[in-house]
C-alpha cells in the first residue's frame, strides 16, 4: 500500500514538472499515431511515463473520440475518391503533403543532423511493409463495406501480441491467450470463409494487418535508437516513393480488369482539382494524430485506450450514411468480438505493467500509424533540458 501511494505521489509530481513541456513535445508524440492510422493496433510497446490526474480523463476521452472520428472521415474520403481516381497517385501525393509538414518539424525541434540515419535497412523494410500493406487495404475499399474492411484490419493488435510472443519472447498469460483466441474467432466470422458469400478480397485487409504487425516488431528496434519523428518521417516518405514502382509492377505482372480500375497505373484522371481534397486528407490525419497524442498525454491510458475501438462502430455508421452500406450480420458479430477481445487485452496489459513498473502508456494502432514509440528520454524532456 505504501509503495502504491509513493508511486502515485511521484507520478503527480513528475506530471506537474513536465506540464510546461506538453505543447513542445506534442508534435513528436503525434507521430506515434501515424496514421494507421489505426487503421489499427493499440497493444504494442508499453513504456513508462507519468500518468495524468483523473480529473483530466474526460478531456482525454474527448480528444481520442474526436481523433478517431477524424480518422473515420479520412478513410471515408479515401473510399469516395477511389471511385474516380487510381490509388497510386492518391497515396503518393498524400505522402508528399504529410512530408511537407513533418520534415520542417524535425528541423525546427532539433539540430539538422538528427534527420540523418544509419538504420536504412530497417526503415526501407518498414516502408515496404507499409506501402504493400496499405495499398492492399485501400484496394479493398471499392469491393467491401467500410465496416468490413476496418473490422478485419483490427486483427492487427491481435497479431502484434502473437508476433511479440513468438519473435520477441514476451510472456503471455492465460487471460490474454483466451482473449486472442476469442478475437481471432471474431476475425474469422467477419471474413466468413467457406460460405457462398465469401469474398477473396477480404483477405487484403488481413494481409495489411499482418504487414502492420510485422512492422511493429521493427518499430521496437528503431524506437530505442532514433526519435519517433525521424523514424515516422522516413517511413512515410519512403513508403510514398515505393508505391510508384509497386503500382507499376502490379500492372505489369497482372492483367487489371474493369473491376480493378482503381489499381491501374494511370495518371490521366488525376487533375489539380483533386489537390484540395488531398490536402484535406493530410490535414485530417495530422489533426487526428495530434488529438490521440494529446489524449494519452493528459489522461490515464487505461481510461482512454478502449475508446480507440469506437472507430469500428463509427465506420459502420458513416458507411451507411455516405455509401448506403448495410453491414452483414457476420461483420457486426465479428466486430463485437474483436472489440471485446482488444479492450480486454489492453486492460490486462495495463494491469500487468502497473504491477511491474508502475503507470504506463502505449502505442496507438490507428490506421496508417507508423507505430514508432518514443524512448522514455524523448517523452520526458527533463533528461535533455536539465
Feature names for model-found ranges:
Residues 81, 90, 140, 146, ...:
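Hydrophobic/aromatic residues within transmembrane alpha-helices
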Residues 153, 169-189, 195-202, 321-341:
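Loop-to-transmembrane alpha-helix entry segments
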Residues 89-92, 96, 141-168, 301-318:
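Specific alpha-helical transmembrane segments that line the substrate/conduction pathway
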Residues 59-65, 112-136, 200-206, 257-287:
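Loop-to-transmembrane-helix transition segments
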Residues 150-155, 222-238, 286-320:
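Helix-helix packing/entry segments at the starts of transmembrane helices
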Residues 44, 59-63, 84-132, 211-215, ...:
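Transmembrane alpha-helices of multi-pass small-molecule transport proteins
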Residues 197-260, 264, 268, 357-386:
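Transmembrane alpha-helical segments that form core, pore/gating elements
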Residues 44-46, 313-386:
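C-terminal-most transmembrane helix of multi-pass membrane proteins
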Amino acid at each position: 500500500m505504501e509503495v502504491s501511494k509513493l508511486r502515485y505521489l511521484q507520478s503527480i509530481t513528475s506530471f506537474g514538472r513536465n506540464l510546461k513541456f506538453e505543447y513542445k513535445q506534442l508534435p513528436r508524440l503525434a507521430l506515434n499515431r501515424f496514421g494507421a492510422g489505426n487503421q489499427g493496433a493499440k497493444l504494442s510497446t508499453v513504456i513508462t511515463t507519468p500518468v495524468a490526474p483523473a480529473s483530466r480523463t474526460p478531456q482525454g476521452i474527448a480528444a481520442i473520440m474526436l481523433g478517431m472520428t477524424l480518422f473515420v472521415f479520412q478513410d471515408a474520403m479515401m473510399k469516395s475518391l477511389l471511385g474516380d481516381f487510381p490509388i497510386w497517385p492518391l497515396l503518393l501525393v498524400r505522402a508528399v503533403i504529410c512530408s511537407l509538414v513533418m520534415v520542417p518539424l524535425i528541423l525546427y525541434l532539433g539540430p539538422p543532423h538528427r534527420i540523418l540515419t544509419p538504420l536504412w535497412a530497417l526503415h526501407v523494410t518498414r516502408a515496404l511493409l507499409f506501402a504493400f500493406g496499405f495499398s492492399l487495404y485501400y484496394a479493398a475499399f471499392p469491393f467491401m463495406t467500410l465496416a468490413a474492411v476496418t473490422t478485419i484490419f483490427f486483427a492487427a493488435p491481435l497479431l502484434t501480441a502473437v508476433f511479440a510472443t513468438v519473435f520477441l519472447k514476451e510472456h503471455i498469460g492465460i487471460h490474454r491467450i483466451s482473449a486472442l483466441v476469442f478475437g481471432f474467432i471474431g476475425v474469422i466470422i467477419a471474413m466468413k470463409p467457406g460460405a457462398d458469400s465469401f469474398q477473396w478480397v477480404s483477405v487484403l485487409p488481413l494481409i495489411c494487418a499482418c504487414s502492420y504487425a510485422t512492422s511493429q516488431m521493427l518499430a521496437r528496434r528503431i524506437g530505442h535508437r532514433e526519435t519517433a519523428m525521424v523514424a515516422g518521417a522516413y517511413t512515410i516518405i519512403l513508403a510514398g516513393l515505393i508505391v510508384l514502382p509497386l503500382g507499376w509492377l502490379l500492372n505489369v505482372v497482372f492483367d487489371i480488369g474493369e473491376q480493378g480500375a482503381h489499381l491501374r497505373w494511370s495518371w490521366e484522371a488525376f487533375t489539380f482539382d483533386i489537390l484540395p481534397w488531398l490536402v484535406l486528407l493530410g490535414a485530417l490525419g495530422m489533426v487526428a494524430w495530434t488529438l490521440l497524442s494529446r489524449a494519452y498525454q493528459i489522461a490515464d491510458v487505461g481510461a482512454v485506450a478502449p475508446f480507440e475501438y469506437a472507430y469500428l462502430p463509427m465506420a459502420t455508421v458513416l458507411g451507411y450514411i455516405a455509401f448506403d452500406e448495410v453491414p452483414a450480420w457476420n461483420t457486426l458479430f465479428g466486430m463485437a468480438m474483436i472489440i471485446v477481445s482488444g479492450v480486454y487485452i489492453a486492460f490486462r496489459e495495463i494491469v500487468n505493467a502497473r504491477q511491474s513498473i508502475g503507470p504506463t502508456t502505449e502505442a496507438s494502432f490507428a490506421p496508417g500509424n507508423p507505430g514508432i514509440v518514443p524512448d522514455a528520454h524523448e517523452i520526458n524532456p527533463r533528461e535533455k533540458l536539465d
